[in-house]
Curated annotation (Swiss-Prot):
This is Cytidine monophosphate-N-acetylneuraminic acid hydroxylase. It comes from Asterias rubens. The lineage of its organism: Eukaryota, Metazoa, Echinodermata, Eleutherozoa, Asterozoa. Its cofactor is [2Fe-2S] cluster. It holds the Pfam family Rieske. Pathway: Amino-sugar metabolism; N-acetylneuraminate metabolism. Binds 1 [2Fe-2S] cluster per subunit. One of its GO terms (molecular function) is metal ion binding. The gene is cnh. It catalyses: CMP-N-acetyl-beta-neuraminate + 2 Fe(II)-[cytochrome b5] + O2 + 2 H(+) = CMP-N-glycoloyl-beta-neuraminate + 2 Fe(III)-[cytochrome b5] + H2O. Its EC number is 1.14.18.2. Sialic acids are components of carbohydrate chains of glycoconjugates and are involved in cell-cell recognition and cell-pathogen interactions. Catalyzes the conversion of CMP-N-acetylneuraminic acid (CMP-Neu5Ac) into its hydroxylated derivative CMP-N-glycolylneuraminic acid (CMP-Neu5Gc), a sialic acid abundantly expressed at the surface of many cells. One of its GO terms (cellular component) is cytoplasm.
Length: 653
């Protein structure tokens, strides 16, 4: 039986707006009683509005003996509930029992805030799919089950005679050119990956679905079985466009055992916050369970198996341009630093609590080992601090000393049998002298490949702007965006475009000035290579904002969920027809932009690009000074003066 999402009850937009900050007790009938907690501190981020993580929900039923909760009159923060049977207390903000302390966590329902302002409370059914055909653990031998860490979220799992890999990002960048591998993978990674029996890929982000890695894999073994979840946004939605040949992709329903052999099976489960794209996996070998929650914010709606043999999850944070790439208003360096510090600490404690709830034999923090290594992203690297895996493991050990923890190094191997029986040597580190951290990334190869898009002929016709934004399909939203193309360091670039798009109507319009009506305004300065690659290939906008490839300001300072959600996962699944566009332009005899490619720039035209619509002199493309060309004649003059002075001195002696 596959897992399905079922709406338990709904609140209308009016009922949702009437929810108070803190605890709300809702009774639909004697048997239908619920708790909804509304977090007044929830904030918008660049990836999601506050409403997506503002609410928590559960049945109004104590986990101890089924009593009903009432508000605790001693609680001044409006988050503590007291059971009428035995006085147990639940903190609705964390969904953990605080009396008795360290006892249980409450099983949660999944709140989903809708576009019309209504709120659905959803339950995954069956809520605990791993209970279906449950198996008792069988004895293991040393060496029978081994987990080898490679990089980021990529591990090799030996399950008897079977080899399974997860999320292979082992070469090249992710999110265009924004993320680079922190760790150097084992030297034989490609041989081992190509010989694997199966691969699980959790979702479509390029630090998990990495086409540079998969391209090399496909040349060795295009028929390797690859398993993905049946998400509404398909993991391999851009496979054909990528040119990578993979012939054995399996799309699987959620919460259903996938039988590999008599000893090995696994299931894919959805995320409660991002069910349209994020998944996690539960692996069962002879009744021993390995839980890989990857990037899921609320894996399986918060209901996870207890007492698994091993758990792996993300931990680091920093997987977004917010707030480092934002400017204006409150976004001072001090505000950013405080925000990052606060959010990383919250994430650290959230992950600690999640691990304690699952109570695995051993826990491994992973899926956070990336670095903003390119020199042009030095600012991001210095400000986008991330959690330390050792700090998380120390926190877990402080409150749950029985949980073993592992901060992995590439090539290190965990033996599950040794971990279960309590051996201290359950980890085998790679040989001394093995390189752990990468110190070379082949920047030029990958950045040049991206920047080839700058020279695509479509950008010689300004009409590409109208063609592309009509293709996106986003409309009927009172938002004006300004898109400005910049160089790698976000300085003006000759031939770059600078334009506005207004989405208020059935079709976008393209004003040269901001409209007089009241409207939301979003301004983005984008690296020209990444911007043009995104446009030409019809890619999701993740490369721009998760990859730190733009700089953003907005008026008012509001997160526009509908816009970002559309550009992130709702773009058309067919590419823009650029061949047809070029054919039409040439048939119509459309004029080309005077300068549309920085390589065309000459001193004569560099002072002004009349094809660009100017908004202000500080940001107008094509109006900046080229200091190298200005200083070249000056250098000649200085040299001539120097020669003259030398001659004068020699003659005066």
């Amino acid at each position: 039986m596959e897992q399905e999402r079922e709406i338990v009850f709904s609140l209308s937009p009016e009922e949702t707006s009437e929810l108070k900050n803190g605890v709300n007790l809702i009774s639909r009938s004697e048997k239908e009683k619920f708790v909804i907690y509304k977090d007044p501190t929830a904030e918008n981020t660049v990836e999601e509005p506050a409403t997506s993580h503002m609410y928590k929900a559960c049945l109004n039923k104590c986990k101890h003996q089924g009593g009903t909760f009432i508000k605790d009159i001693e609680d001044g923060d409006n988050c503590i509930l007291r059971c009428t049977k035995h006085g147990w207390k639940l903190d609705a903000k964390t969904m953990r029992y605080v009396n008795p302390p360290d006892s249980f966590s409450q099983q949660q329902l999944v709140p989903e805030y809708n576009e019309d302002g209504s709120l659905d409370i959803v339950e995954l059914k069956p809520p605990q799919p791993w209970e279906t055909d449950k198996r008792d653990p069988m004895p293991l031998e040393v060496g029978e089950v081994q987990i080898t860490y490679f990089t980021h979220a990529c591990i090799e799992i030996k399950l008897g005679d079977l080899i399974m890999f997860t999320d292979p990002w082992l070469i090249g960048p992710a999110f265009a050119r924004g993320w680079w591998l922190m760790h150097e993978p084992p030297a034989d990674w490609l041989d081992r990956l190509a010989k694997a029996d199966l691969i699980y890929i959790s979702h479509l982000h390029s630090d998990h679905l990495n086409y540079p890695t998969l391209e090399l894999l496909s040349q060795r073994n295009p028929d390797i079985p690859i398993y993905v979840g049946d998400t509404s946004m398909p993991v391999f939605v851009r496979l054909e466009q990528s040119g990578v040949k993979l012939n054995n992709i399996h799309i699987k329903k959620f919460g259903k055992w996938i039988e590999i052999n008599k000893d090995t099976r696994f299931m894919i489960m959805m995320d409660g916050v991002h069910p349209d794209m994020d998944t996690c996996a539960l692996i069962d070998y002879k009744g021993h369970l390995i839980l890989d929650t990857v990037d899921c914010t609320n894996p399986n709606g918060g209901r996870l198996p207890i007492g698994v043999d091993m758990m792996l999850s993300d931990f680091a944070g920093g997987a977004s341009g917010f707030p480092m790439t934002f400017s204006g208003g409150k976004y001072t360096e001090e505000w950013k630093a405080e925000f990052v510090k606060r959010e990383r600490r919250k994430l650290l404690y959230y992950k600690m609590q999640q691990v304690r709830d699952v109570a695995p034999t051993v826990y491994c923090p992973f899926a956070g080992y990336f670095v903003e290594a390119h020199p042009s992203d030095h600012y991001i690297r210095s400000t986008n601090t991330k959690n330390d895996p050792d700090a998380l493991n120390a926190l877990i050990n402080k409150y749950s000393p029985n949980i073993k923890t592992w901060s992995p190094s590439p090539g290190a191997v965990l033996d599950l049998k040794k971990a279960i029986q309590g051996d201290r040597d359950f980890i085998t580190d790679p040989p001394r002298g093995t390189q752990k951290f990468k110190d070379s990334w082949d920047f030029e190869k990958y950045v040049n490949a991206i920047n080839k898009n700058i020279e695509e002929e479509i950008f010689s016709y300004p009409e590409w702007i109208q063609f592309y934004y009509k293709w996106t399909g986003f409309k009927n939203y009172n938002l004006v965006i300004r898109m400005v193309e910049r160089d790698d360091d976000f300085c003006p670039v000759v031939g770059g475009y600078d334009f506005m798009v207004d989405f208020v109507g059935e079709e976008p319009t393209f004003p040269t000035e901001r409209p007089a009506r009241e409207h939301s305004y979003l301004e983005m300065e984008n690296r020209i290579g990444v911007h043009r690659e995104t446009v030409r290939q019809g890619l999701f906008w993740d490369d721009l904002y998760i990859g730190f490839n733009n700089r953003i300001s907005r008026e008012p300072d509001t997160f526009h969920y509908l816009f970002w959600n559309h550009m992130q996962i709702l773009l058309p699944r067919t590419d823009p027809d650029w061949e047809g566009f070029l054919r039409d332009m040439k048939t119509e005899g459309a004029p080309q932009k005077a300068i549309w490619n920085p390589s065309q720039a000459t001193p004569a035209v560099e002072a002004k690009d009349p094809s660009s619509d100017s908004k202000d002199s500080a940001t107008k493309p094509g109006t900046h000074w080229n200091y190298e060309r200005l200083l070249r004649p000056l250098g000649i003059v200085v040299a001539l003066v120097g020669v003259g002075v030398a001659i004068w001195k020699s003659e005066s002696k």
